[in-house]
Amino acid sequence: MNHENYSDAYLRAILTDAMTIAIVGASPRRERPSHRAMAYLQRRGYRAIPVNPNAAGDTILGETCYASLADVPEPIDMVDIFRRSQLAGPAVDAAIAAGAKVVWMQLDVRDDAAAARAEARGVKVVMNRCPAIEIPRLRLPPLSAAR
């Protein structure tokens, strides 16, 4: 797949099919982009599950934070990665192992080798994009209204 440009249809399908999103690198600090994105996704009707070993066991925006994707006790539709590109590969591999249908790497996060591994396993991949930007750009309704 060409990861330079994604069709609106591809992004729309991902963002309307996913209901449970694990946020790798979620932060309890309000000023952090991962915290703001998680709050936005919750407001839009997604179940956002924080994953951060430094905050494991804590509550972030009303959700228990897990140390790893393997610790999340429910199915994950999409994994949203807030890690530097150099650290994205292990998160992608963990997403594959967890059975996620989609791996989404945030703005300025790109790992082509990890993307290829995911796609070889049938996992959809988005890199260098933010759902909190794409949802309003695509004019997607909140999940509860869309279903």
Where are these predicted regions, by residue range?
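A charged, well-structured terminal subsegment
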Residues: 134-147
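Glycine-rich, highly charged phosphate/nucleotide-binding loops
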Residues: 1-7, 58-74, 80-89
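NAD(P)-binding Rossmann-fold cofactor-contacting core
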Residues: 29-32, 39-59
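ADP-ribose/adenylate-binding Rossmann-like module
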Residues: 95-118
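Short acidic, glycine/proline-enriched helix-loop-strand junctions
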Residues: 74, 111-135
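Structural motif
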Residues: 77-78, 102
